[in-house]
Amino acid sequence: MAWKNVIASGDIPVSPELVWLLVRDFCGKWHPAISTMGAEHDKSGRLLRVFTVHSQDVVYRERLTWFSDSDRSMSYTHVEGIHGVEIYNAQLLVSNNKDGGARITMTAKLLAPDPRDEEIAIGTKKIFDEAIIEIKKLTKLPMPLQAPSNSNFAYDKPIQTFAFGDTPRLAISHIGEPSETLCLFLHGIGGNKSNWNQQLASVAPYVQSAALDLRGYGESTLGEIQSNVDEYCDDILSVADRLGALNLVLCGLSYGSWIATSFAMRYPNRLSALVLSGGCTGMSEALPEEREAFRLSREVPINEGKTPADFSEDLLPVISGPDISNAIKVELLNSMQAIPTETYIDALKCFTNPVEKFDFSKITMPVLLMTGEHDKLAPPDEIRGVAKRIFETAPEPDVRFECVTGAGHVCNLENPNSYNTALVDFIMRVIQ
């Protein structure tokens, strides 16, 4: 057997954004060959489209493996229906063409015995060509101006805050009805649980949600020893037990993303999904001398007798985007200025002493990665690269990547509407 590659492309004189709105629904019934179309979810929440075509009795199933509104791309894999194929992976991409319009590119890579491989390749090319012709026709009809959003439903109950335990004492904000699944938010090294209030309210209509003050932050206390990632994972399990949750959707920002991924390495069976914002690998892939240099540079103001409150304004330009509002500036400053020096040092030592390099083949759950358009600490190209690595390494990938427009490092605060739209859309799918 040998690999066969199929490619088809075409230009359309309308914007790529409008073309993407037409085709972004993986289970959309727009192709002229489709007779029936439906959606299914496997036990891990992965999305499959189930369809039949005209003049055939065959049922086809394809599973979504990659999706990005930001990059206007999706990838999928064959599950059932194509006789004789061993592997069949395909992609649809909508990009800018040189004339200011849209270019649609559809590709497939397949493996099947000879001569069946050639038959499948010819059939695929025909399907792709028909798709591009149909899309050109559809762009001449009235179209929606934006993708549907599920993030604007209000939840009419307030966020409740409480603490439990002794050393450490863990404080959480909680909202939503008790359920087997909990969406737990983990803040960054300069934040606290209140940074997630807008996300808690957006997610609560669909699943119970909580935000944790990490050890030493906000209303939580430090433990008896230097914090490490295993203790953070124990804290996550403690919160889940306290709220009666068997399964978790972990949503982290920066330092919290690194902790969330560390949890995924240890307890993949407890995770329904993983949401990583403004980070993932932390310093786990940096050389020892790079980690040490990073730690020492961050400790300079501390060694000069300053507290986080003293140097928070110096950090603000590093973590914020160019269009940050005054209200969000104040919120970020308040978060950073509230960090005790002891807590800052504790988190810094933990962050710069990772115990492992992540093995993305252990990622068995759906993953959403987001970062701000203007994030200097976790730039879009870097996080897109991490997303691609997970896509290429995970045994059954289900990866989504989004770049949050206009936002800096704390993208959930700077552009909550875009952030919440992607988050809620993702959560609604994976907790089916």
Where are these regions (language model features)?
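Hydrophobic-ligand binding "helix-grip"
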Residues: H31, E40, H54-G101, K109-L111
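A conserved amphipathic terminal alpha-helix motif
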Residues: A108-N150
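Active-site loop/oxyanion-hole signature of alpha/beta-hydrolase fold enzymes
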Residues: P168, S173, S194, Q198-A201, ...
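Flexible "cap/lid" loop of the alpha/beta hydrolase fold
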Residues: T261-R266, L271-E304
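Short beta-strand/loop motif that positions the catalytic acidic residue
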Residues: I363, L369-T371, D375
